[in-house]
Amino acid sequence: MNRAHYLKTDIRRLIKNYPIYLGIVGVAISMWFSLEDSAFTEGMVNGNALDTYDLAVGMSGIMIAYVFCAFSYATVFCEDLEYKYARYSINRGNTWKYVVSKAVVVYGSSVITMVLGSLLFVASIRLKIPWTSEGLQDIFMEGMYGSLIAGEHYWSYVFLCALQMGM
């Protein structure tokens, strides 16, 4: 059994399992909780989505989001050992390929959960407030991925920031 079969099986198992979808929603909700009182004010943080997102990922509530990222597929080793699926898979293939496949899918699922949860959060705040305010855009222009803000590629900015957090 080659590595591609292990990966296909693990990815299929990930997609058919509901915890990844709960994890995505959990990441978005934990970002809402991270805003604390700012989530319930009229303009949220400075009246724009980028400042609100920046505050949400900078506060301590974001630590809960990492738990939701691990929630989606990190229990796979325990489940495989409990139901004796690990023994069956290793006997059919190779221990090294089995472990590498599981590790790749666990890592990938946590990154995907963080990215999609962050995009869900930003989409929900974007319904209420604009992307930026005129005078407050300079802070993001000097920071990481500032060229994306200058080109008004806000979704790409959020995607790359969430990808970096998920890694």
Description of each model-found segment:
Residues M1-I24:
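Aromatic- and glycine-rich beta-strand/loop motifs that create alpha-glucan
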Residues R3-I11, W96, V100, V104, ...:
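Alpha-helical membrane-protein architecture signal
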Residues D10, L14, S89, G166-M167:
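Generic transmembrane alpha-helix motif of multi-pass integral membrane proteins
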Residues L22-G26, V100-S101:
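Hydrophobic core positions of alpha-helical segments in small-molecule transporters
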Residues A28-T75, V104-M167:
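Secretory targeting signals
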Residues V76-S109:
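Helix-loop-helix units of permease transmembrane domains in multi-pass membrane transporters
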